[in-house]
Amino acid sequence: MHLPGCPPAMADGSFSLAGHLLRSPGGSTSRLHSIEAILGFTKEDGILDTFPAERSSRGSKERDPRLGARSACPKAPAGGSESSPPAAPGLVPEFEATRPCYPKEQGEARPSPGLPVGPAAGDSKLSEEEEPPKKKHRRNRTTFTTYQLHELERAFEKSHYPDVYSREELAGKVNLPEVRVQVWFQNRRAKWRRQEKLEVSSMKLQDSPLLSFSRSPPSSALAPLGGPGSGSGPPGSALPLEPWLGPPLPGGGATALQSLPGFGPPGQGLPASYTPPPPFLNSAPLGPGLQQLGPPPAYPCAPAFGDKFSLEEAYPRNSSIAALRLKAKEHIQAIGKPWQAL
């Protein structure tokens, strides 16, 4: 036993804890008055300091099962069980003491001790995504005055596509930016195109009834023409057109020829001042029109016609349709000669 305070003993380190253990391998529990005891070092601390290799191997054995079990949280060791030695107080990070324990899934990376753990890193990304999109800047509408609109319309009448120099000159005249003038011309051209399309469509709608109306009268006008020629129409259904302008129609039935003065029953003579019209001209409205033309030069033809075909001979022949047609042709030819001379 050496007393503390002996200088030779302190110099050679005989009072170290390792030397004490070698001298007393039994590990007596009696506290010696050594330098370690005076300085406050315990026996366990001395053992830990003496065997650093054993401490590192023991700590690695306990860390390996903890890393292998990812679904369970590390629990505090029990009082009687062997636990890993406490590390130095300056090496333990503060975040490990306050970090909550969550079961880890496979493939999940463990957070590095140098970075803060928690939703702080993800919150910044979520906040950026959840922010509403910025509203598009909308330009205020330009309100044109009457003078500006008048000048712009005048320029548009001159040219629908003014060049940049004309636009700049007009912009300075109406006190507007050149960009606003350009946009106004674009809108005005679009409006002009819409108006042109509407006008074309309206003209097409108006033309369609006119075409149908213009095609219908010729088809309806064929009925009056066929009526008097065939003798089936009434005597008063004559055309309002001038009859001598059209070609003479061939003779019809016996009723049309009997209406002529020359082919009537005996006792009716031809007047000297009247020329019998063709069958399709037998209508009252056309009688005065023919009389106003003056005395026709066909007077000599009437007596010759009467001399050749007497009334007494003509009346019995009414029963013969062939004779009636022959007389009608000759009569029309005789009447057509004076009008051709005019």
Curated annotation (Swiss-Prot):
Annotated segments matching region Disordered: 49-141, 209-295
An example Gene Ontology CC term for this record: nucleus
Keyword DNA repair belongs to the record: no
Sequence motif: OAR, positions: 319-332
Classification via InterPro entries: HD, Homeobox_CS, Homeodomain-like_sf, OAR_dom, RAX/RAX2
Compositional bias annotation for Low complexity: 209-225, 235-244
Residue ranges annotated as motif Octapeptide motif: 33-40
Cellular compartment(s): Nucleus
DNA-binding region extent: 137-196
Regions of compositional bias (Basic and acidic residues) in chain numbering: 55-67
GO molecular function: DNA-binding transcription activator activity, RNA polymerase II-specific; DNA-binding transcription factor activity, RNA polymerase II-specific; RNA polymerase II cis-regulatory region sequence-specific DNA binding; sequence-specific double-stranded DNA binding
GO biological process, one term: brain development
Pfam families: Homeodomain, OAR
Motif residue range(s): Nuclear localization signal: 325-329
Keywords in alphabetical order: Developmental protein, DNA-binding, Homeobox, Nucleus, Transcription, Transcription regulation
Main location group: nucleus
Signal peptide per UniProt: none
Disulphide bonds in the chain: none
Protein family according to the UniProt entry: Belongs to the paired homeobox family. Bicoid subfamily.
Protein task: Plays a critical role in eye formation by regulating the initial specification of retinal cells and/or their subsequent proliferation. Binds to the photoreceptor conserved element-I (PCE-1/Ret 1) in the photoreceptor cell-specific arrestin promoter.
Name of the protein: Retinal homeobox protein Rx
Organism from which the protein derives: Rattus norvegicus
